[in-house]
């Protein structure tokens, strides 16, 4: 259902407010560069510091601007099941193709709680769900056997796996079947992830290098592993540099270097990346031939 290079879109703010005009142009550029789907209001989009109304507005704008050219997977996660459902219903009404639903964070449910959370969402909304597993942020990890139990639900169609454990791809194939959509959530591990059966990456780096990331994904899908490895070598310093300080600070800094009039604006508690981080981004952009 979903595959290829899928940017987890940044949300541009200017003087603290959503810069809708720039965002619409950014969506067009991403599609023109070969991104195969778009994810607004994920972690990289600073969804944690948006109001519910603002969050839903950004999702609507993304869907409007995409105009059906590529699927839109709306960020809909919350540690409050009722709020996650509210986001899903709003995204479905706006025309989203799927919801990206992060595991509930901070309150740390057990595996039974995770099943109950996702069953409540699927019982009350028919929008397809991609489960988002990122234990480093949520302090909760969905186990392959738990995911397998959820994979039997028609509207749970895939996972964004940012567990950092590439062997999970094989374990999840065993529990969920080979047709369950597995998307890497780590740019730096995407090559191994794809080789083991993944079908794409929900990417931070694609914000800055959408064309190269799309080319990398196409090479993997075509089985051109030598070409994919060459692109991995080209992009790897950028994958690392974009996490050399708290994300999405480095990726927004990179965009001020590479994308016209991109605003240098983050919402607290996020702050601008350090001088060392900015230098790492500069060097990585040069290595990738972007700036």
Curated annotation (Swiss-Prot):
Quaternary structure and interacting proteins, as annotated: Homotetramer; dimer of dimers.
Pathway, per record: Amino-acid biosynthesis; L-lysine biosynthesis via DAP pathway; (S)-tetrahydrodipicolinate from L-aspartate: step 3/4
Cell compartment(s), UniProt: Cytoplasm
Superkingdom of origin: Bacteria
CC terms in the record's Gene Ontology section: cytosol
Similarity comment: family membership: Belongs to the DapA family.
Keywords, alphabetical: Amino-acid biosynthesis, Cytoplasm, Diaminopimelate biosynthesis, Lyase, Lysine biosynthesis, Schiff base
Binding site for pyruvate: 44, 202
Active site: 132, 160
EC number: 4.3.3.7
Cross-referenced PANTHER family: 4-HYDROXY-2-OXOGLUTARATE ALDOLASE, MITOCHONDRIAL, DIHYDRODIPICOLINATE SYNTHASE
Protein role: Catalyzes the condensation of (S)-aspartate-beta-semialdehyde [(S)-ASA] and pyruvate to 4-hydroxy-tetrahydrodipicolinate (HTPA).
Molecular function via GO: 4-hydroxy-tetrahydrodipicolinate synthase activity
NCBIfam families hit by this protein: dapA
GO BP terms in the entry: diaminopimelate biosynthetic process; lysine biosynthetic process via diaminopimelate
Residues under site feature: Part of a proton relay during catalysis: 43, 106
Full protein name: 4-hydroxy-tetrahydrodipicolinate synthase
Organism field: Rhizorhabdus wittichii (strain DSM 6014 / CCUG 31198 / JCM 15750 / NBRC 105917 / EY 4224 / RW1) (Sphingomonas wittichii)
Enzyme class: lyase
HAMAP family (UniProt xref): DapA
Classification lineage: Bacteria, Pseudomonadati, Pseudomonadota, Alphaproteobacteria, Sphingomonadales
Disulfide bonds: none
InterPro entries, per the entry: Aldolase_TIM (IPR013785), DapA (IPR005263), DapA-like (IPR002220), Schiff_base-form_aldolases_AS (IPR020625), Schiff_base-form_aldolases_CS (IPR020624)
